[in-house]
Amino acid sequence: MTRTLIVWGAGRIGRGFVADLFDSPAFHTVFVDIDRALVEELNARGRYTIVHATRDGLSRRVVQNGFCAVHTDDAQALNALFEEDQLLLDVAVHEPKLPEVSDMLLPLLRHRMTVCPNAVMDVMMNVNMPHPDECFLSLTRERFTDAESAWFTAHVGVTGIFAMCISPIAPEWLLKEDSLVLFNNGYPEQAIDKNRLKGEAPALPRLRLTEDVAREETRKLYTLNMAHALISYLGLPMGLKTSREAAINETLRPILTGALEEASFGLSRELGFSEDEMTEWRQTILRLLENPYIEDSLQRLGADSRRKLGAYDRLVGPARLCAKHGKPPVQLAKAIAGGYSYENDDPGTHAVRDFVRAHGFEAALAEFSDLHPGDGIYEYVCM
């Protein structure tokens, strides 16, 4: 039986990573997106290129057939999809869009409950944030009645994911060849929590089933995503432009490695990763950042500083674990401080900078990062 995979969000991760993992005769992939022009182009062409850029070089593959695209306004097509047995849904959107996507999914889930109340489905949350599965569950429960919540709990599995796919905008020379091209680091797998699934677990070579995906999600957020934020907030004032340029910079490198060591210290004591595991993990992160083909923009990596400076997000989160277990988060604190000076033309960053100008740096630390004197972090950020 061919199963349907809905990828909600046909962007760089949805098309370039998730659909690549599920490119199998066992699955029919349906992209759902709000961009009508993209939906029409995908359907008209029926193919697109993915370029994997690893340290060893570039490789290409063409994804064709086996997929179609649907616009978010096409209620009839979406209702039909949500009647499929053993349905899989991968939500691949940016964190700020999650409430909006939850609102779009609500009538579709209600339709499924009405038309096929005994059918099960599973949702994979491919959203770059702490605990996206719990956030999605909270958003749905806020919108459901008690009876609907009971049905949802019994028939819909929701799992976070773990992956380290880095997917910047494709270079101009590739876009000239194929306007739909995706460009990423060729990360080989995605992990999901098998204990959260209601339906049959997908059997695919690059989909790994784990028993605690939240632990792996947290490690990734507090190391790889932390590193991206750090090199952005500290690299831009130095005149650096790209992730690789920052990762190998002789001034910034010791701060980066020191912050990774601080994060590792907290993670190993809080979540049980061994020192050997974390040493190997840090080397993996550095190799990803040193990839000569993935020149991600530091300006892009720092965007939405309000979110990235959040109390349990990629910078303050590992600093809290580090301080909790007795180690001063000196290098992480430098990145947190740098984030409050970051400038970008997005609403989250504007909110941070406007607040700093109106109320001062210390008040902003309390407002956005929940940092206060005596918490083991505040003093180092204010040094």
Region roles according to the model:
Residues 2-6, 12-383:
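Substrate/ligand-engaging "lid" and interaction regions
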